[in-house]
């Protein structure tokens, strides 16, 4: 077993992992052990692993998903949550694209980067952290669960409240 800490939307989270893959996937978010106890703790619970097992995922990847679920369950108590969506920063504001898997979130990120170049930074390609700050603002943070597009920014970006649900594949076909 390995213990390490990550930054989970500004909160220290202690991770207990059996598989080296988990630490590798969390590497960009790893922090030094905090002076005070971790606010969040996560390890792979056998019940969660059984629920997520579909026969195709490796035990190491199942552990990574279990840790995701464990953190996701604890975050709301701290005014934070993980959201399924792709997040970019553009001119200092975060934009979040939400939709079911396979409907074009990654494509939207790629197109924004293609047409707007260096003004666009990928915050997270699959499951960013969101936090509600004491002043009422929402911030978007990267997370280790980045999907197909690697996160570039690991700092928080103020959201502009412009979450967009991407069009379904059928709608995209009709417009081509």
Q: What name fits each language-model region?
A:
Residues 108:
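Hydrophobic positions on the alpha1 helix immediately C-terminal to the Walker A/P-loop
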Residues 105:
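Conserved lysine of the Walker
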Residues 1-101, 111-123, 129-176:
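A noncatalytic interaction/capping subdomain that flanks phosphate/NTP-handling catalytic cores
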